Structure formats: structure tokens, C-alpha cells
Curated annotation (Swiss-Prot):
One GO CC term on file: host cell presynaptic membrane
The protein's name in its UniProt record: Hainantoxin-III 9
Record keywords: Amidation, Disulfide bond, Ion channel impairing toxin, Knottin, Neurotoxin, Presynaptic neurotoxin, Secreted, Signal, Toxin, Voltage-gated sodium channel impairing toxin
Function of the molecule: Selective antagonist of neuronal tetrodotoxin (TTX)-sensitive voltage-gated sodium channels (IC(50)=1270 nM on Nav1.1/SCN1A, 270 nM on Nav1.2/SCN2A, 491 nM on Nav1.3/SCN3A and 232 nM on Nav1.7/SCN9A). This toxin suppress Nav1.7 current amplitude without significantly altering the activation, inactivation, and repriming kinetics. Short extreme depolarizations partially activate the toxin-bound channel, indicating voltage-dependent inhibition of this toxin. This toxin increases the deactivation of the Nav1.7 current after extreme depolarizations.
Signal sequence bounds: 1-21
């Protein structure tokens, strides 16, 4: 009983240390994850001439960034699946 309580407290202490040490890395994790999923930097839309995910577009015009296509149904840029 004492050993299991000690292991539980040691585990919680270790979890606290790991969370505290990785706190600064966790703040950038969602941005890195989205950048890798969509293969473009979706957070710098003002710097580029193309439109990113969810931006309104006109079907037929090549306004969307690479890896995106303008949806004729919804009229916004979405991920191009190659169909």
C-alpha cells in the first residue's frame, strides 16, 4: 500500500516536471501541426498572393494556393484531393 502511494506521487511529480519543461514547446505545437498537415503556412496569408484554406474565391480563377482548390459549391478554398 505504501509502495503504491509512493509510486503514484512520484508519477504525478514526474508528470508535473515534464509539463513544466515542455510548456514553451506546446505553445507552438498547433501551428506546426497545421503547417505540416496542409503543407503551407496558413498563418501568413497577408504575405502571399494566393488564398489559403477557408478563404472565399471565384471558381474557375486560380486564386487558391498550391494544394488547395476553389470549391464551386461552397466558393471557398479547400484542400485539393486530386479527384
Amino acid at each position: 500500500m505504501k509502495a503504491s502511494m509512493f509510486l503514484a506521487l512520484a508519477g504525478l511529480a514526474l508528470l508535473f516536471v515534464v509539463c513544466y519543461a515542455s510548456e514553451s514547446e506546446e505553445k507552438e505545437f498547433p501551428i506546426e501541426l497545421l503547417s505540416k498537415i496542409f503543407a503551407v503556412d496558413v498563418f501568413k496569408g497577408e504575405e502571399r498572393g494566393c488564398k489559403g484554406f477557408g478563404d472565399s474565391c471565384t471558381p474557375g480563377k486560380n486564386e487558391c494556393c498550391p494544394n488547395y482548390a476553389c470549391s464551386s459549391k461552397h466558393k471557398w478554398c479547400k484542400v485539393y484531393l486530386g479527384k
